[in-house]
């Protein structure tokens, strides 16, 4: 008897859960099947405009009924559609871009979601030292010109006496060796690589150097100035008050 009671209680619980799940699914389907109504503001100056509006919405995305009011420039659309904005965009695309939604009120801020700005890390500048055989100045020029054409390379410094090439730029040194073999057809061997700091760190170091230097004062030497000396008019004939003896 006890086992039968437990089995009966478990069956009742399962039936209640199924009923709840069924009710929730029915509620969701009812919400989707509910008839909605939206009011659009569309400028219509004649019956032809009204027929164009109703023609572009007829049978679109669950639209069932369309009512146009030319005097008030309103279009009332009712039906079982999911998104009212689709109806508005349909009218803007097919009839007029100046169409607006009166009800339900729409918040444009919800659509204009600002994309998350990803912080771009400063690219790492690397310096790779490669071993390459260079027989003459022509080989040196060809290697330098060929490596400079590779994307991300900033500077190339070949040294014929040591058979080395110092390459600086934003790159992956092992891949650079493969590109040199494919494009130039020359053997290259990676000896060492150095990763430099980003641009931001360089700016900080420069600011520290400027602060340590302090304020500099520059003094300019005096300039040569020549003044024109006018002749004395004390004893001239034009001076009435000059000495008569003189």
From Swiss-Prot:
PANTHER family tied to this protein: HEAVY METAL-ASSOCIATED ISOPRENYLATED PLANT PROTEIN 7, HEAVY METAL-ASSOCIATED ISOPRENYLATED PLANT PROTEIN 8
UniProt region (Disordered), positions on chain: 1-31, 96-122, 191-226
GO terms of molecular function: metal ion binding
Source organism phylogeny: Eukaryota, Viridiplantae, Streptophyta, Embryophyta, Tracheophyta
Gene that this polypeptide is encoded by: HIPP08
Family (UniProt): Belongs to the HIPP family.
Positions that bind a metal cation 1: 46, 49
Job description of the protein: Heavy-metal-binding protein.
Protein name in UniProt: Heavy metal-associated isoprenylated plant protein 8
Compositional bias ranges of the Basic and acidic residues kind: 108-122, 196-214
Residue span(s) of the pro-peptide: 244-246
Residues annotated with Cysteine methyl ester modification: 243
Keywords in alphabetical order: Lipoprotein, Metal-binding, Methylation, Prenylation, Repeat
Superkingdom assignment: Eukaryota
Binding residues annotated for a metal cation 2, in chain numbering: 136, 139
Positions of the HMA domain: 35-99, 125-189
Lipidated positions per record (S-farnesyl cysteine): 243
